């Protein structure tokens, strides 16, 4: 679902993008999606940092389950 918002932008940038027929709404939407994805990944990493450290310690002590299948 889309939501209408109002943003304030630099006039020169707006005019240039408009002159090149850039879909400004699409550009803003894509930029917002990318930032939301980055923020979710950052939050996930913070929430799971302890678990990832525990897995790293386990692998350090016991090796990886894939070690026996490595050919390199």
Curated annotation (Swiss-Prot):
Segments of this protein annotated with the region Interaction with CcdB: 41-72
One GO term (biological process): protein-containing complex disassembly
Any one GO MF annotation of this record: toxin sequestering activity
Residue span of region Interaction with DNA: 3-40
Keyword hit for Kinase: no
InterPro entries in the record: Post-segregation_anti-tox_CcdA
Disruption phenotype: Leads to cell death and induction of the SOS pathway. Additional disruption of ccdB reverses this effect, i.e. no cell death nor induction of the SOS response. The double disruption leads to increased plasmid loss.
Post-translational modification: Degraded by the Lon protease.
GO CC list: toxin-antitoxin complex; transcription repressor complex
Pfam families per record: CcdA
Record key words, sorted: DNA-binding, Plasmid, Repressor, Toxin-antitoxin system, Transcription, Transcription regulation
Positions of the UniProt region annotated as Not required for antitoxin activity, or rejuvenation: 1-36
Coiled-coil intervals, chain numbering: none
Cross-referenced NCBIfam families: PRK13710.1 (NF010264)
Quaternary structure annotation from Swiss-Prot or TrEMBL: Homodimer in solution and when bound to DNA. Three CcdA homodimers bind to the promoter region and contact each other via Val-22. Forms a complex with toxin CcdB; there are both high- and low-affinity binding sites for CcdA such that both CcdA-CcdB(2) and CcdA(2)CcdB(2) complexes can form. The CcdA-CcdB(2) trimer is sufficient for rejuvenation, whereas maximal operon repression occurs with CcdA(2)CcdB(2). When the CcdA:CcdB ratio is lower than 1, a CcdA(2)-CcdB(4) complex is formed which is devoid of repression activity. In this case repression is alleviated and both proteins are produced.
Similarity comment: family membership: Belongs to the CcdA antitoxin family.
Function (record text): Antitoxin component of a type II toxin-antitoxin (TA) system which inhibits the post-segregational killing (PSK) of plasmid-free cells, also referred to as a plasmid addiction system. Labile antitoxin with a half-life of about 1 hour in the presence of CcdB. Binds to and blocks the activity of CcdB; will also remove bound CcdB protein from the CcdB-GyrA complex by forming a CcdA-CcdB complex, a process termed rejuvenation. The N-terminal 36 residues are not required for rejuventation. Functions as a transcriptional corepressor for the ccdAB operon, repression also requires CcdB.
Protein name: Antitoxin CcdA
Annotated source species: Escherichia coli (strain K12)
Gene behind this protein: ccdA
């Amino acid at each position: 679902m889309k939501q209408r918002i109002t943003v304030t932008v630099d006039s020169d940038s707006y005019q240039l993008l408009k002159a090149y027929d850039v879909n400004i709404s699409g550009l803003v939407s894509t930029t917002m999606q990318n930032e939301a994805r980055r923020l979710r990944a950052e939050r996930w990493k913070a929430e799971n940092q302890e678990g990832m450290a525990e897995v790293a310690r386990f692998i350090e002590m016991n090796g990886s389950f894939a070690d026996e299948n490595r050919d390199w």
